[in-house]
């Protein structure tokens, strides 16, 4: 039994050996245990794989050269793991690293480090030892069986989960921290989105309220229009009010235009608004009216005074209006003589005025008499500012009111020629043999600015004719006309007392003597 059994047993062994020859050939003998001086084969293979420059795109050393980084885990599991470890399970590779004390440096990438795993120092791999399992030998017996099962799993199945688990405690903590950071980021994003949602809800509520208000106003408007359409009287009243307002506007504009026209045409019309506007004429019309009134008031009393008094005609040297010399018979005031050769003028405080009569011919016309009267008025008005600045009416001056200056003052005024004193060049020509005087009628034509009043000319008394005793005595007198005039002036001044503070009689006599001497000198000079 035993040989058969033994033979059968050998045959079985032989059969078994023949059948299992391919499985026993790769490992004819058990792998020798690594000695204490030799590094583990896993670490050696891992070092060679990381140190290979051709695989830097997949796995390489870190910039600090104290760790390595798996840049592309899928390619690493597909190409490198089968080449070096005869499997393609990335989680199994991470678990092996965990058993040798590797730790994950960066939670965001697959970077592992160990104190004995440094670039260029391969001899330090001997210092890395494998950790003993916590469950003892039973776990070691189950480990090959579990390893075989993991090899049977499809590649990439629960690789990330397995990696997190197999990395160990350090890997889990890093993963938890990363998840916490991700959670915080997500929470911040969620808060921001909720705030946006809240603001959007508020805007939406505001829009809804506005839409509701618009709908309400639209409904009210529609109801109002419906009532208006159903009420014809309301529409008629509305149209009437519109027409009245338009008419009122038109009437207002018309009234304003009519108001301006009325004010421009008739100043006495009261404006429509009840205000009384006083008419104010233009300055030209007012000035013209004032000049007319002044001419009427000033001319009448002067002519009356001259007509009432036969001795009211005064002899003076009035400056002519033209250069033509003619014999004019006119009574004018003896006023200041204009300077002809640089001689001093008469002082304003001692203006002289004398009165006397001059002959007048029957050939004078009413227009000529008017001319003489106007000349009298003009020259009497010119003497007013010379008599002390007082407000004296020219027509009220008489012989008793006139002030005669001293001879010393007249000597500075009277020229050497006798004819200049009485203004012969301006008023009188040489007397003819028959005792008649020629009168230049053309020179007595009134100016354009003088207004003549024919009514006043009738009131003037007739002048003495040539045949009167006065003129005969005047013409037959052996003395010159100037001397006769001086005598007449002296007689007049003696008969009429003067009340002006001077000794009139002595002054007039002295004046007569001086003027007579002056006339004699002038006659001798002329001869």
Swiss-Prot record:
Family: Belongs to the HSF family.
Organism name: Solanum peruvianum (Peruvian tomato)
Known partners and oligomeric status: Homotrimer.
Composition skew (Pro residues), residue ranges: 25-37
Pfam families from the UniProt entry: HSF_DNA-bind
GO CC entries: nucleus
Stretches for region Disordered: 1-37, 130-160, 243-275, 300-343, 476-501
Modification after translation, per record: Exhibits temperature-dependent phosphorylation.
GO terms of molecular function: DNA-binding transcription factor activity; RNA polymerase II cis-regulatory region sequence-specific DNA binding
Portion annotated as DNA-binding: 39-133
Compartments in which it is found: Nucleus
GO biological process: cellular response to heat; regulation of transcription by RNA polymerase II
Descriptive protein name: Heat shock factor protein HSF8
Start-end of Low complexity biased regions: 1-13, 136-157
Keywords in alphabetical order: Activator, DNA-binding, Nucleus, Phosphoprotein, Stress response, Transcription, Transcription regulation
Functional note: DNA-binding protein that specifically binds heat shock promoter elements (HSE) and activates transcription.
Biased composition (Polar residues): 319-328, 491-501
SUPFAM superfamilies: Winged helix' DNA-binding domain
